[in-house]
From Swiss-Prot:
Organism classification: Bacteria, Pseudomonadati, Spirochaetota, Spirochaetia, Leptospirales
Keyword Electron transport tagged: no
UniProt similarity note: Belongs to the RecF family.
Binding-site list for ATP: 30-37
NCBIfam families registered for this protein in UniProt: recf
Pfam families in the cross-refs: SMC_N (PF02463)
Cystine residue pairs: none
Listed name of the protein: DNA replication and repair protein RecF
Gene for this chain: recF
InterPro entries assigned to the protein according to its UniProt record, in alphabetical order: DNA-binding_RecF, DNA-binding_RecF_CS, P-loop_NTPase, RecF/RecN/SMC_N, RecF_2
């Protein structure tokens, strides 16, 4: 996986930026607020078609403009791809996506073309904020490579919204609510099966990574505890919980209530871990995602690393450098130009530096 070119127009504070990449390691250097993370964000859209920072895509548009556009050329598994993505500022947020000139009517059909892993400071919330954030992380990770899962998830969420609307409806009959139960059960089962297999694999990578990061001092585990374990149990719970669900106005069982404990002996890292332990767990988890994609596809995903190296101690930096040496291509943002050589100066791979100032980009030099 290798990104060769990117062109962005009216994206955040970038009016028009065009870059060509020839190196495995690319650094975006600049003070806070100058637009370096915006560049990383534009690259992440090639994978996720949405920001890793912002839920409202209208915020991606440059101030006082009506649309934004991204064009990129990348190579994957020996094939060349031309990616074109436009977002129009409106209540409906009209989007148009083309790959090699072919328009995608459904965004979910694009999944898996450009694979990347984002590492950024807010990732610590995966540990600190518990199961809602962890389910969001897991869904995003699986959906980034599995189109079938994404379609199942989209349909499940649509069905839950429909059932919840019926639950809130005054004098809704049990039959009116129950018509949603069977399709919900079917989609829930598919999602649960894929989540189970994913966590079984991801957990192994995570545990080994964390042992290596902590020199064996933090033997924590990632586990998956589904809210429902079978179709039969799900059907019975929907019946048993109907009165309660009517009272609270939403569906109280299903995969949207799954838990993903990280810790040991029923103790979760969110409650007892130090900041260093939590940071190590995040790095171990994101590295596990990288390793799992690399091993299942045979090709390393692109790493997008947003200003986190300076937060790491010596041990974690060494681990990070080893990870970088395994990747196909990595993009970094940092304010610390002087520290780059200290982190990756010994790696015998090509490197490029770009200086970002008020949304303007210029080539600095090779390290």
């Amino acid at each position: 996986m290798f990104l060769k070119k990117i062109y962005i127009k009216n994206f955040r504070n970038h009016e028009e930026t065009q870059l060509t990449f020839k190196s495995r390691l690319v650094f975006f250097i600049g003070n806070n607020g100058e637009g370096k993370t915006n560049l990383l964000e534009s690259i992440s859209l090639l994978s996720y078609l949405k920001s890793f920072r912002e839920s409202d895509q209208n915020q991606l548009l440059r101030w006082d403009t009506s649309d934004t556009f991204i064009r990129a050329e990348f190579e994957s598994e020996g094939n060349e791809y031309l990616f074109e993505y436009g977002i129009e500022h409106s209540q409906t947020k009209r989007k148009k996506l083309k790959v090699n000139g072919e328009e995608f009517k459904k965004i979910s059909d694009y999944v898996g073309y450009f694979r990347s892993i984002v590492m950024s400071p807010p990732d610590i919330l995966i540990i600190e904020d518990g199961n809602v954030e962890r389910r969001r992380f897991l869904d995003a990770f699986i959906s980034s490579t599995n189109r079938y899962y994404l379609k199942q998830l989209i349909e499940y969420e649509r069905l839950i919204k429909q059932r919840n609307a019926a639950l809130k409806k005054e004098n809704a009959s049990d039959r009116e609510i129950g018509i949603w139960d069977e399709p919900i059960i079917e989609h829930d089962s598919e999602i649960r099966e894929i989540r189970t297999k994913t966590i079984q694999s991801l957990a192994g990578y995570f545990h080994q990574n964390l042992l290596q990061l902590s020199s064996g001092k933090d033997p924590y585990f990632l586990t998956y505890k589904p809210n429902i374990t079978s179709k039969e149990e799900h059907k019975q719970k929907l019946i048993d919980n109907l009165r309660k669900d009517k009272a609270i106005g939403y569906t109280s069982c299903g995969n949207h209530r799954d838990t993903l404990p990280i810790g040991f002996d029923d103790k979760d890292l969110s409650g007892f871990g130090s900041q260093g332990q939590k940071r190590s767990a995040v790095i171990a988890l994101k590295t596990a995602c990288f390793q799992m994609i690399r091993d299942t596809t045979g090709e390393a995903p692109v790493l997008l690393i947003d200003d986190i190296i300076r937060e790491l101690d010596v041990k974690r930096r060494e681990y990070f450098v080893n990870l970088i040496s395994e990747c196909g291509q990595a993009f970094f943002t940092t304010t610390d130009l002087e520290g780059i050589n200290e982190y990756v100066g010994n790696l015998t791979v090509d490197k490029e530096i770009y200086i970002i100032d008020s949304g303007k980009v210029k080539v600095f030099t090779e390290i």
